[in-house]
Swiss-Prot record:
Task performed by this protein: Transcriptional regulator that specifically binds to GA-rich elements (GAGA-repeats) present in regulatory sequences of genes involved in developmental processes.
Originating species: Arabidopsis thaliana (Mouse-ear cress)
Protein name as it appears in the record: Protein BASIC PENTACYSTEINE7
Segments of skewed composition (Basic residues): 88-105
Listed PANTHER family: PROTEIN BASIC PENTACYSTEINE3 (PTHR31421), PROTEIN BASIC PENTACYSTEINE7 (PTHR31421:SF6)
UniProt gene name: BPC7
Compositionally biased region (Basic and acidic residues): 66-76
SMART domains, alphabetized: GAGA_bind
Pfam families: GAGA_bind (PF06217)
Amino acid sequence: MNSFPAQNLMLSATNANKDSGLRTSNAHWLHSCIAVPKTTGIDLSQEPPAEGVMVPQSHLFPPPIRDSRNDTETVKQKSVNQSPSKALKPKPQRKKRSVSNKSKKTPSIPETKREKKNLDINIDISSFDTSGVPPPVCSCTGVSRVCYKWGMGGWQSSCCTISISTYPLPMSTTRPGARLAGRKMSNGAYVKLLARLADEGYDLSHPLDLKNHWARHGTNKFVTIK
């Protein structure tokens, strides 16, 4: 008797297949006969896959691990986009600037009533005689000060400028040795003022106070002279 009956069965099966003319595969026999060590990590309890059967990739590779941080970030973005409270918040109204700063600025010159200039008045000053009229004065400091001659028959204040009112005027910082220039009135504006006051009944034998007749800025050259 043979002490290896399994080998005899394998030989008899292969010889029978050869005689019948069929091709055989010894993979199954080899798999069943070859001993696999336990250290290989292969689970022997599972049956080997049949020949020609595709094994799904889910059994070969583990499923990918999803990062929970991305899920939390997407949930936060959705909650931010879906919150209507931020989109419906009304814009805060801007506070209007108070006008108190302008009122706090007090000019050094006391405010006086200025006459309204009528630019449509045309006065013929060619026949108006100013030879007997005394030089004008300015009483912005409380005392009447005689004005200086300026230009071609014009007059300049000796005690006030647009911003200050004092006598004598302080020295100029831009022109060494000269004082600040006072307010000015051209000859045409002065003669026109005399003609208008004479029509109103003013006595031209007395010096004319130019305190309320100075121009607000610069000179009185805006009048029309004919």
